[in-house]
């Protein structure tokens, strides 16, 4: 009895490679989807968010506008500083009054500011200057808030008024300084004796008023130079 070994040969009917082909197709599709994924993601990205702007204080802004604004702030502070000396000079001169009794109270010498026309003019000039400085503060604030070329007319107006007030204070201070000098030193040729040896309080008040007035004149000079510089740069 012979046994024959049966050999089984599997026939390829075209169905067996189907799973492999399907796997290859899926891999190709996945790779293609991965390749195109960044493009679709990048296309779907929203627009770039706006950058956050940091607010810079208006005093620190660079350029011509910041320069003009800084000078405007200094202008405001100088006007406030000049108001004190002019007001103090006016009050000190207006209250300069001293009496000197000789032997009895019925025989007295009197020294008062209105006895000298120069001191009267001096008092009025300082009062006008103090009032002007107060009235000019709102205009100075406008220049601070709007330091552009549109406020050139305001700057020019302040410049002209500053020049007039400086000239007024200079004239009044010079006239009062001459009287104070004569009161301290006298004049031998004219036979004018010094009176400050007797009227100490009167001379101290008037002398201090003259010094305060010339300090205000210096402040006005600085204001005029600053205003002229700004107007020159804005053209």
From Swiss-Prot:
Assembly notes: Homodimer and heterodimers.
Record function comment: Regulates membrane-cell wall junctions and localized cell wall deposition. Required for establishment of the Casparian strip membrane domain (CSD) and the subsequent formation of Casparian strips, a cell wall modification of the root endodermis that determines an apoplastic barrier between the intraorganismal apoplasm and the extraorganismal apoplasm and prevents lateral diffusion.
Topology in the lipid bilayer: Multi-pass membrane protein
GO biological process: cell wall modification; cell-cell junction assembly
Cytoplasmic side: 1-70, 140-162, 232-235
Entry keyword Signal: no
Residue intervals on the Extracellular side: 92-118, 184-210
GO cellular component: Casparian strip; plasma membrane
Keyword entries, A-Z: Cell membrane, Cell wall biogenesis/degradation, Membrane, Transmembrane, Transmembrane helix
PANTHER family from the UniProt entry: CASP-LIKE PROTEIN (PTHR36488:SF11), CASP-LIKE PROTEIN 1U1 (PTHR36488)
Keyword Thylakoid among UniProt keywords: no
Location in or out of the cell: Cell membrane
Chief place of localization: membrane
Family membership noted in the UniProt record: Belongs to the Casparian strip membrane proteins (CASP) family.
Residues making up the signal peptide according to the UniProt record: none
Transmembrane parts of this sequence: 71-91, 119-139, 163-183, 211-231
Protein name: Casparian strip membrane protein 2
């Amino acid at each position: 009895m012979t046994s024959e070994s049966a050999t089984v040969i599997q026939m390829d009917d075209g169905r067996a490679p189907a799973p492999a082909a399907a796997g290859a197709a899926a891999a190709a599709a996945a790779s293609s989807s991965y390749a195109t994924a960044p493009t679709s993601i990048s296309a779907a990205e929203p627009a770039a968010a706006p950058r956050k702007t940091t607010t810079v204080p208006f005093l620190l802004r660079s350029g011509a506008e910041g320069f003009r604004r800084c000078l405007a702030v200094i202008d405001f502070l100088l006007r406030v500083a000049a108001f004190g000396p002019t007001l103090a000079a006016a009050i000190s001169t207006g209250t300069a009054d001293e009496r000197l009794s000789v032997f009895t109270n019925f025989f007295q010498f009197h020294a008062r500011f209105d006895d000298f026309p120069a001191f009267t003019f001096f008092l009025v000039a300082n009062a006008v200057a103090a009032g002007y400085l107060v009235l000019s503060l709102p205009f100075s604030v406008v220049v601070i808030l709007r330091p552009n070329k549109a406020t050139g007319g305001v700057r020019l107006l302040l410049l002209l008024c500053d020049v007039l007030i400086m000239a007024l204070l200079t004239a009044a201070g010079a006239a009062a300084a001459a009287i104070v000098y004569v009161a301290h030193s006298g004049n031998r040729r004219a036979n004018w004796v010094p009176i400050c040896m007797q009227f100490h309080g009167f001379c101290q008040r008037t002398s201090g008023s003259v010094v305060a007035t010339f300090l205000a004149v210096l402040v006005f000079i600085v204001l005029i130079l600053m205003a002229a510089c700004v107007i020159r740069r804005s053209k």
